[in-house]
Amino acid sequence: MSSAKEIKKSILAPVLDNNPIALQVLGVCSALAVTTKLETAFVMTIAVMFVTALSNFFVSLIRNHIPNSVRIIVQMAIIASLVIVVDQVLKAYLYDISKQLSVFVGLIITNCIVMGRAEAFAMKSAPIPSFIDGLGNGLGYGFVLITVGFFRELLGSGKLFDMEVLPLVSNGGWYQPNGLMLLAPSAFFLIGFLIWAIRVFKPEQVEAKG
């Protein structure tokens, strides 16, 4: 992966062409849990990008020295170490957000996207392409999180990043917040609409009828 075109493709392809959530249906649980606010969705995106990119890099770096029988354990050990770093940094510098994200930072360890890229790509590729692949898949995951988080916070509370955007009835405005948007089912609906929109734009992603 030497050309700028290939690097660009590796980073941008997971956003629409091969999105981990919208096409592969991976990492959905955290997408439901951390998208009530745009702030938590953004921080979770950065966390997953960091873990996916660096775990890919380190797994690729030692891939030729990992016995096949313990490769999954080694991958999980690397991922877990990076997740612990992220968790400690959040607790030290963004404690309130860390509390809101709760156990879902720790559950990055079991995120199918992170494990999947380490096994499917990093074990077969050089370190730099693996790092870029991790960034791209983290970005694709974050694209869905941030999109869903944007609509859930805006429609659910009339705010973005805790700043009032839609004038609330309680403050003399016209917007009555939709409480449903703050509940997990709304994330299912929004992810469904997003998948539909992507497949309208990218009809080749529609499954062939049997």
Curated annotation (Swiss-Prot):
Q: Which UniProt keywords apply?
A: Cell inner membrane, Cell membrane, Ion transport, Membrane, NAD, Sodium, Sodium transport, Translocase, Transmembrane, Transmembrane helix, Transport, Ubiquinone
Gene Ontology BP terms: sodium ion transport
What is the E.C. number? 7.2.1.1
Q: Where are the transmembrane segments?
A: 11-31, 42-62, 72-92, 103-123, 131-151, 178-198
Which InterPro entries is this protein grouped with? NqrD, NqrDE/RnfAE
Reactions the enzyme catalyzes: a ubiquinone + n Na(+)(in) + NADH + H(+) = a ubiquinol + n Na(+)(out) + NAD(+)
Q: Which GO terms describe its cellular component?
A: plasma membrane
- UniProt subunit comment: Composed of six subunits; NqrA, NqrB, NqrC, NqrD, NqrE and NqrF.
Described purpose of this protein according to its UniProt entry: NQR complex catalyzes the reduction of ubiquinone-1 to ubiquinol by two successive reactions, coupled with the transport of Na(+) ions from the cytoplasm to the periplasm. NqrA to NqrE are probably involved in the second step, the conversion of ubisemiquinone to ubiquinol.
Protein known as = Na(+)-translocating NADH-quinone reductase subunit D
Q: Which gene encodes it?
A: nqrD
